[in-house]
Amino acid sequence: QKPFFLACGIYRPHMPWQVPRKYYDMYPLDKIQLPNVPEHDLDDIPPAGVRMAKPGGDHAKILKTENWRYAVQAYLASIAFADVQVGRVLDALDASPYANNTIVVLWGDHGWHLGEKKHWRKFSLWEEATRAPLMMVVPGVTQAGTKCDQAVDFMNIYPTLCELCELPRGEHLDGLSMVSLLKDPAQTWERPALTTHGRLNHAVRDNRYRLIRYQNGDEELYDHSQDPMEWKNLADDPQYAETKERLAKWFPAKNAPDAPHDASLGQGKKKKQQQGKGKSKKKSAQP
């Protein structure tokens, strides 16, 4: 009779990509398909975007060491491992008395580049880094196997849960309830998804376009109906001026300052190790 909330964080596919061998074996190296990365992909990217991508960093190292296929294999193996762990949680729920009155939300906090646009990790405003899974099961509301193609962002999760659980929603929240989409995935949704990486760097994504604007005003625009890999930057094309203006209205009117950084955090262990140096000449029996 008492409501409960359970948060279950599954660490993979976060680095390091170390999982049992059987998950690597699911993806033989000779079957791995590497991303298609045009040699001149970054030529039409503004300097701010290139700096964020850092093609001379991770991607250059991956190419030099010839580890691209190994990296993709390890990422896929980590996802397969995570999938099994999700299954364990859901199996336990299905076997419990709460299977038919528990809302399930499965989501990942960000995507990941595996060399697309000569970039690795997250840390960008492109599709690969900003698109992530979002799945919801609401007994009596959602239908199994349905898919919603609307672009939404994670600010909407909490307001959605508030409405579903009949809880008061704080007026300070920027997100919107997605209950209408859960009931009807084809429902009209006018608000595009907003992503921020670093202060004053934003991307707005609707069902067709992605508009990126960096802190210095540099822009990128991609038409996903024609260019799903974001290879052609349309930001300087005059015929898309109206599209840019429409999407730019969704950029934040205000930008909160960065959170204060406490330089002392994480220094305790290091300080303790430094203090312990030279106190004993006795060799440790441990490796």
What kind of feature is each model-predicted range?
Residues 16-22, 26, 91-143, 150-153, ...:
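Histidine-centered active-site microenvironments of extracellular/periplasmic hydrolases
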Residues 5-12, 103-108, 135-136, 193-196:
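Short beta-strand segments
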Residues 1-39, 94-103, 242:
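Active-site regions of oxyanion-processing enzymes, predominantly non-cytosolic
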Residues 64-77, 121, 141-152, 164-169, ...:
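Active-site rim elements
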Residues 60-102:
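A long, amphipathic alpha-helix that forms part
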Residues 110-116, 122, 142, 153-224, ...:
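C-terminal cap/loop subdomain of S1 sulfatases and analogous C-terminal strand-loop tails that border
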Residues 24-28, 76-79, 83, 87-94, ...:
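Non-transmembrane alpha-helical segments in soluble domains
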Residues 16-63, 272, 281-283:
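Core domains of carbohydrate- and sulfate-ester-processing enzymes
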